[in-house]
Curated annotation (Swiss-Prot):
Subunit organization: Part of the 30S ribosomal subunit.
GO biological process: translation
Keyword flag rRNA-binding: yes
Signal sequence region: none
InterPro entries, per database record: NA-bd_OB-fold, Ribosomal_uS17, Ribosomal_uS17_bact/chlr
Organism of this sequence: Cereibacter sphaeroides (strain ATCC 17023 / DSM 158 / JCM 6121 / CCUG 31486 / LMG 2827 / NBRC 12203 / NCIMB 8253 / ATH 2.4.1.) (Rhodobacter sphaeroides)
GO function terms (MF aspect): rRNA binding; structural constituent of ribosome
UniProt GO cellular component terms: cytosolic small ribosomal subunit
Source organism superkingdom: Bacteria
Entry similarity comment: Belongs to the universal ribosomal protein uS17 family.
Protein name, per record: Small ribosomal subunit protein uS17
Source organism phylogeny: Bacteria, Pseudomonadati, Pseudomonadota, Alphaproteobacteria, Rhodobacterales
PANTHER family from the UniProt entry: 40S RIBOSOMAL PROTEIN S11 FAMILY MEMBER (PTHR10744), SMALL RIBOSOMAL SUBUNIT PROTEIN US17M (PTHR10744:SF1)
Gene: rpsQ
C-alpha cells in the first residue's frame, strides 16, 4: 500500500523536532451540493527544525515515531 502524502500549513513549531500541520480538505456534500471545508491537525517529524509557522509543507505517512507522531515532513510544497 502506498504512503499517503498530504499538504498543509505549519501552525506550531514550539516542540523540538516536531511541527503541527493543519490540513484542509474540501468536498461537495452529497445531499446539499454545498462545498464543505474540513480541517485536521497532524503532528509531523521535523528532524532539523527547519520549518516555521506559516510554511506550506508536504507530509508523508511513516512508521510511528512517538505516541502522537506518525507523519514526517518531506519538503516545502510548491505553491502553484
Amino acid at each position: 500500500m502506498p504512503k499517503r502524502i498530504l499538504q498543509g500549513t505549519v501552525t506550531s513549531d514550539k516542540n523540538e523536532q516536531t511541527v503541527t500541520v493543519l490540513v484542509e480538505r474540501r468536498f461537495k456534500h452529497p445531499l446539499l451540493k454545498k462545498t464543505v471545508r474540513l480541517s485536521k491537525k497532524y503532528r509531523a517529524h521535523d528532524p532539523e527544525n527547519q520549518f516555521k509557522v506559516g510554511d506550506i509543507v508536504r507530509i508523508e505517512e511513516c512508521a510511528p515515531i512517538s505516541k502522537t507522531k506518525r507523519w514526517k515532513v518531506v519538503t516545502d510544497a510548491v505553491v502553484a
